[in-house]
Regions:
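Histidine/acidic-residue-rich, glycine-tolerant segments that coordinate divalent metal ions
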Residues: 22-23, 46-48, 52-64, 70-71, ...
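Acidic/His- and Gly-rich active-site-bordering loop/insert found
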Residues: 1-65, 74-77, 81-89
Length: 214
């Protein structure tokens, strides 16, 4: 879709950068300065089912834009259209449509594929939608704005048994509950209150819904 939109606007672009990334180039009315600025948006969706009934809901089962990357892509396409129609600047604007932002190292793949050797940029700008901000407002700050994240997976092995005889089992659900609660003290008691950190355990899989008493 992105490639089709860029082609319709007559914007030169390269597909397959970092496997599924797209890079477009818009040149200003003049390029005497030799300056080049990159604008980047992420494109990937999340592997989850969208249960909304909006007209703009995902058309693909098991995949949805739960983090607003469709909005980011739309904004970058709008910027591409405006820049291509006006070209009221000196230099070059590189439009970077990045895949695999949600934990799949799409940005790294593009860089390793020679992104900045093929499309040099003096600076690169990006943004993230923030529903809590009023329409028409943007928020900036010096220093880091968005945090990097690590993923953890904890496997708990218990001992099966019947819910009526908990003393004969080792209940992994109870253990998981204690871990989830205790994890919240990691930040509260190990990170300075003037620093920023978040620990979130966002999913738990335990037991079987078809066997409620086991």
């Amino acid at each position: 879709v992105v490639s089709e939109r860029l082609a319709a606007l007559g914007i030169e672009h390269q597909t397959g950068v970092g496997k599924t990334g797209i890079v477009a180039v818009v040149r200003g009315q003049t390029t005497n300065s030799g300056r080049s600025v990159g604008l980047r948006a992420d494109m990937d969706a999340l592997p989850m089912q969208e249960d909304n009934t909006f007209a703009h809901r995902s058309r693909y089962d098991g995949r949805m834009h739960g983090c607003g990357h469709d909005g980011h892509t739309t904004m970058l396409l709008a910027a591409a259209r405006y820049l291509a129609l006006t070209r009221a600047f000196d230099g070059t604007v590189t439009l970077i449509f990045q895949p695999g932002e949600e934990g799949y190292a799409g940005g790294k793949a593009m860089i390793e594929d020679g992104l900045f050797e093929r499309f040099p940029a003096d600076q690169v700008y990006a943004l993230h939608n923030w529903p809590g901000l009023p329409v028409g407002k943007i928020a900036v700050r010096p220093g880091p704005m968005m945090a990097a994240a690590d993923r953890i997976t904890i496997d708990i092995e218990g001992k099966g048994g019947h819910g009526a005889h908990p003393h004969q089992a080792v209940d992994p659900v109870l253990v998981a509950g204690h871990i989830i609660t205790a994890a919240q003290s990691i930040v509260a008691r190990n990170v300075s209150p003037i620093d920023t950190a978040v620990v979130s355990l966002c999913a738990m899989h335990a037991g079987h819904p078809g066997a409620m008493s086991v």
